[in-house]
Amino acid sequence: MKKHFLLAGFAALMLAACNNKPASELTLSGLDPAKFQTEVNNAQTALYTLKNKAGMEVCITNFGGRIVSIMVPDKNGKMQDVVLGFDSIADYINVPSDFGASIGRYANRINQGRFVLDGDTIQLPQNNFGHCLHGGPKGWQYKVYEANLIDPTTLE
């Protein structure tokens, strides 16, 4: 029995080792930048990593300017990710959510997707239970932005 357990454990370790990327290719939070490279509406997406002198790290994708990960030290100094995010661009594209979105036409809901401006009633698309949420189904959080990593602390 011990022999089978040891063989199974060894096999599991070998399989795990075969699938791991070198640590230098991953972000501090364990994200693989290659999993954020795709094309959306003829524009290239990517993952950008910012770091400060204190060791904090922020990962942002140019797909909607979404914050994917923020690594900060906990009370014991251990780095922890404080963002609820996905580990690939595919999930941000295919799972209906606004996770990490830092940009949009507006925040929250417009009741029944309708408002009055200068006496005219404006009807917006209803994308959330009869209401218009965060700019509608094609809000700015779904656009791909041009980005340029100037240095480890500056993204433009």
Walk through the language-model features, giving the residues of each.
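Sec-dependent N-terminal signal peptides
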Residues: F5-L13
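C-terminal motif of bacterial Sec signal peptides marking the signal peptidase cleavage site
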Residues: L15-A17
